[in-house]
């Protein structure tokens, strides 16, 4: 009997995300908030919403909802771009900086606990296998 690999991977992502959401709850944030803030923090300053959506790998309407929530919490600001009034530039606020450090600590601790008992070699092999799967899927999508 073949393994339902797609279902297994989807379930893994779902329970991993639920654990991160649970652990970020005391900070009143979610895994989606973390991914967005982390990417804003890592990317060069004044990224547009379009650039950020591409970096995260999501559609812009999904990102806008998350950015609305983060702006409501006072963690980001959005300014209209002078050269293109349709584009908005995203900046972290001063309030976000210490929170990002707290979030990183939660994420790093959780990741270490999840990977407990998995050797560096096993992890490296898993990363390579995931990259191969992703490559194959992208090639299949390109073929149509």
Swiss-Prot record:
Family of the protein in this entry: Belongs to the SlyA family.
Stated role: Transcription regulator that can specifically activate or repress expression of target genes.
DNA-binding region: 49-72
Coiled-coil region list: none
Keywords: Activator, DNA-binding, Repressor, Transcription, Transcription regulation
Keyword DNA-binding on entry: yes
Keyword DNA-binding: yes
MF terms (GO), sorted A to Z: DNA binding; DNA-binding transcription factor activity
Oligomer and partners: Homodimer.
Cross-referenced NCBIfam families: PRK03573.1 (NF002926)
Transmembrane segments: none
UniProt organism field: Escherichia coli O45:K1 (strain S88 / ExPEC)
Protein name: Transcriptional regulator SlyA
GO biological process terms held by the UniProt record: response to stress
HAMAP family: HTH_type_SlyA
SMART domains: HTH_MARR
Pfam family, one: MarR
InterPro entries reported for this sequence: HTH_MarR-typ, MarR/SlyA-like, Tscrpt_reg_MarR-type_CS, Tscrpt_reg_SlyA, WH-like_DNA-bd_sf, WH_DNA-bd_sf
Domain HTH marR-type: 2-135
